[in-house]
């Protein structure tokens, strides 16, 4: 509950103490015990070993992580090749613009960022269109999403839209 509420309360005999608990979790883990899966030439883990390894992170904890991604090994050509990348200044500018959009949108709701969206605020200020509702219904059923997972997708989608200056 502290992750959702942004506060943690400790009850002791002499009273209750409440502390802020806003944080951003950034975590990484190997795909298996040896770290080389899915490269079967270097990974010697059995399927059961991989499954047990991945189950070390509890479902309820995973359900509270907004974005999970798999990273492929970097190819040599990517390290040495010249390619156009967005500058840090350009990214910073987009993020600040997204923050301004969020602060303006949620001013009356008493929040500042998409990460603070409650179910009620999402329903009032981030209504889904017919097409989006259909997509979310299909995702809810096929991915067997929890309510938390459903609203997490909407919060992340709202953030992506803000970064792309879209409604």
Predicted feature residues:
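Basic, amphipathic alpha-helical bundle interface domains used for macromolecular binding and assembly
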Residues: 2-167
């Amino acid at each position: 509950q502290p992750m959702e509420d942004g506060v943690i309360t400790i009850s002791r005999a002499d009273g209750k103490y409440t502390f802020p608990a806003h944080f951003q979790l950034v975590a990484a883990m190997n795909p298996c015990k040896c770290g080389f899966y899915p490269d079967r030439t270097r990974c010697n883990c059995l399927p059961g070993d991989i499954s047990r390894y991945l189950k070390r992170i509890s479902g309820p904890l995973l359900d509270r992580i907004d974005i999970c991604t798999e990273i492929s090994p970097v190819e040599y050509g990517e390290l040495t090749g010249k390619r156009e990348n967005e500058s840090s200044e350009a990214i910073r500018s987009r993020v600040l613009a997204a923050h301004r959009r969020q602060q303006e949108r949620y001013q009356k709701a008493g929040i500042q960022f998409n990460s603070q969206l409650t179910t009620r605020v999402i329903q009032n200020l981030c209504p889904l269109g017919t097409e989006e509702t259909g997509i979310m219904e299909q995702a809810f059923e096929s991915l067997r999403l929890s309510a938390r997972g459903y609203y997490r997708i909407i919060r992340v989608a709202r953030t992506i839209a803000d970064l792309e200056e879209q409604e």
